[in-house]
């Protein structure tokens, strides 16, 4: 993007140079020329009134054959070439040898040769040479005003900009990052595959494949081929099969479908689709389909709030909790041509809100597209030609700080990024593998199977998102029945950050992405109207949690008068009524529950095992119950709705003959008095 901007500015700033006659130059030659024939030929070559361009060029060529070190003749030849190249919109590299000869013979001949030589090297991405000559242009000093173009100030500004960006690019290229891409077999074939995406569980790969039109008569693509929306499965050895066309309602019309994202439970597929809706051009919007027992529901638009009725909306990527969607759009009101937008879903109504621009940390006056939000929920990858890069679209990453604010976008580095467009990048859930699709005749020359293929590589550590795994579980009642329509809230016990799990409303099964960098314990709280409070603390410190965490089972029952439940993970210091810090988060969550259900009246019951004196245990259990009552009142729960009582060892729920039974008996129980 920067090169294009500077090139355009160059065309504007160079007009005076092209219009400038050689007669305006200093009348004295830098080096005395004794050859009269060469002098005569030069005089003819600069006489634009008498001779046409072909004749002048012939005079210059003959002049330089006689006197190759004739500085002014070399400069005149360079000017003629530059004028021609400008008119033909071609690089003016052919003029560089003449400019170099001119300044080699006469360094002070004119300021502009340094500018054009530097610009040419800048355009060719020969940054060291570009910096060298552009700096000479900036430092050029002479009392003769004729040695400066009328547009010198504009050229000076452009030269300084080119120096700045050339230095930045050189610094980026010196920091070469590890990059050893290999083609993803199975998915990649001799035909084109692109717009790929691998599901968060790493088992499914969605992509678009071009196939010969032949016996097909729908979903046409250019070159007599058809675009199919495909899905491939990964086997136990980690290899994808070649894939098959997505079943109906996909691939049934001429509407192009692809560029998708899917919820972590593989149930909700969001994708872009381009279709004609009455206008002369197809409109690209974001759609959704739900999977129920391997059957996809009818396709529907994500919502009127999200899709613009006229402009392009595409390339969705979904957060791990399923409630935030990032996408690219060229709608008006942004920072540039294509911007990244964010829309959030109301957990209650399930309606997507009005999209908000992702802001200037991400979007520029250029174009930003193909966003990918990792399951860690704090690392976003996207492609941009507005942030500083190597040329075309480069891949960038940006992270959130502890306050949830975006920090600064970083170029992912060379040679992952090159002078060509680098787009469609995403990262595996475990953070270790990067994926992208690329044209084999570009930077992947010779490594592909077809033209456009999917590639993978080990992503270097500094560019990785936070390592993430998925915690799964299910909600049941005390009879083992599935609970429908419940919510599962996950709270970090240290930061208090809250996340909603993705819950299957019909089965009660849930799934949530867990950031493994934060080794803090997690509090899982189940919420459902007219049901009792239920929570469980999960430790992520165990090494086995990294791979496939054991599914969590949480029990929740109807909140009936006379029913009771245990407050799990509530601990006190030994022989004391003082709560441990780990218990605070549980009681804070319980306080929220009581405030959300202000009509419930409870009795807090303290219980102990049978070790020790009965009277002492009764007193200890009562003190603990009152400690809980005081904590809840401090958090805003009405004291009128709470009573507290200690029962000591008198109401065991397990045998006191072993430690396992005794630990169950040491508990804080909640009795629902009325609701």
PLM region descriptions:
Residues 384, 388-389, 597, 605-675:
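Periplasmic OmpA-like peptidoglycan-binding domain that tethers envelope proteins to the cell wall
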Residues 30-36, 109-112, 116, 123, ...:
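Short, conserved micro-motifs composed of acidic
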Residues 68, 107-108, 142, 598:
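Short coil turns that delineate tetratricopeptide repeat
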Residues 21-40, 106:
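TPR-adjacent "capping" and linker segments in tetratricopeptide-repeat scaffold/adaptor proteins
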Residues 462-489, 493-601, 675:
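Periplasmic peptidoglycan-binding/tethering modules of Gram-negative envelope proteins
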Residues 34-66, 82-90:
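Alpha-helical segment of the N-proximal tetratricopeptide repeat
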């Amino acid at each position: 993007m920067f090169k294009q901007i500077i090139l355009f500015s160059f065309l504007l700033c160079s007009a005076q140079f092209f219009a400038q006659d050689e007669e305006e130059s200093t009348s004295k030659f830098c080096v005395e020329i004794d050859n009269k024939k060469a002098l005569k030929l030069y005089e003819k070559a600069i006489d634009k009134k008498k001779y046409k361009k072909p004749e002048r060029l012939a005079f210059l060529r003959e002049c330089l054959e006689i006197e190759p070190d004739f500085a002014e003749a070399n400069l005149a030849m360079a000017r003629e070439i530059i004028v021609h190249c400008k008119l033909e919109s071609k690089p003016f590299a052919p003029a560089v040898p003449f400019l170099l000869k001119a300044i080699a013979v006469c360094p002070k001949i004119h300021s502009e040769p340094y500018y054009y030589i530097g610009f040419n090297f800048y355009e060719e991405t020969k940054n060291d040479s570009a910096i060298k000559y552009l700096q000479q242009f900036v430092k050029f000093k002479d009392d003769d005003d004729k040695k400066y173009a009328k547009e010198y100030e504009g050229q000076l500004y452009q030269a300084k900009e080119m120096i700045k960006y050339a230095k930045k690019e050189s610094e980026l290229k010196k920091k070469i990052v590890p990059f050893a891409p290999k083609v993803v077999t199975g998915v990649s074939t001799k035909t084109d595959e692109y717009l790929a995406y691998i599901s968060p569980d790493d088992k499914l790969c969605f992509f678009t494949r071009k196939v010969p039109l032949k016996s097909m008569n729908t979903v046409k693509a250019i070159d007599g081929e058809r675009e199919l929306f495909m899905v491939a499965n990964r086997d136990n050895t980690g290899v994808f099969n070649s894939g098959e066309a997505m079943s109906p309602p996909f691939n049934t019309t001429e509407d192009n479908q692809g560029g998708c994202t899917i919820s972590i439970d593989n149930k909700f597929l969001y994708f872009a689709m381009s279709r004609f809706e009455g206008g002369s051009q197809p409109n690209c919007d974001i759609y959704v389909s739900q999977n129920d027992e391997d059957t996809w529901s009818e396709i529907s638009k994500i919502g009127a709030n999200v899709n613009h009725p006229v402009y392009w909306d595409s390339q969705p990527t979904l957060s791990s909790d399923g409630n935030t969607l990032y996408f690219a759009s060229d709608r008006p009101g942004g920072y540039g041509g294509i911007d990244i937008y964010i829309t959030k879903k109301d957990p209650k109504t399930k309606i997507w809100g009005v999209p908000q621009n992702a802001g200037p940390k991400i979007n520029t006056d250029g174009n930003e597209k193909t966003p990918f939000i990792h399951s860690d929920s704090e690392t976003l990858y996207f492609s941009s030609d507005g942030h500083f890069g190597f040329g075309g679209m480069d891949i960038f990453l940006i992270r959130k700080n502890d306050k949830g604010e975006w920090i600064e976008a970083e170029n992912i580095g060379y040679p992952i990024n090159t002078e060509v467009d680098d787009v469609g990048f995403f990262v595996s859930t475990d953070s270790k593998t990067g994926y992208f699709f690329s044209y084999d005749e570009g930077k992947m020359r010779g490594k592909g199977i077809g033209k456009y293929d999917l590639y993978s590589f080990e992503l270097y550590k500094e560019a990785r998102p936070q390592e993430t795994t998925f915690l799964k579980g299910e909600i049941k009642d005390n009879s083992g029945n599935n609970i429908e329509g419940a919510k599962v809230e996950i709270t970090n016990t240290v930061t208090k950050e809250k996340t909603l799990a993705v819950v299957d409303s019909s089965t009660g099964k849930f799934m949530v992405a867990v950031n493994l960098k934060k080794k803090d314990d997690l509090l899982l709280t189940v919420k459902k109207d007219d049901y009792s409070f239920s929570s469980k603390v999960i430790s992520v410190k165990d090494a086995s949690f990294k791979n496939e965490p054991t599914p969590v089972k949480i029990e929740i029952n109807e909140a009936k008068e006379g029913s009771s439940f245990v407050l799990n993970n509530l601990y006190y210091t030994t022989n004391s009524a003082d709560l441990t810090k780990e218990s605070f988060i549980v009681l804070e969550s319980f306080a929220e529950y009581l405030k959300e259900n202000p009509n419930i009246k409870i009795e807090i019951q303290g219980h102990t095992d049978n070790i020790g004196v009965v009277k002492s245990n009764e007193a200890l259990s009562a003190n603990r119950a009152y400690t809980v009552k005081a904590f809840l009142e401090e958090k805003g729960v009405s004291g009128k709705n709470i009573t507290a009582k200690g029962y000591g060892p008198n109401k065991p729920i397990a045998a006191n003959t072993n430690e396992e039974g005794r630990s169950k008996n040491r508990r804080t129980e909640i009795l629902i008095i009325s609701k």
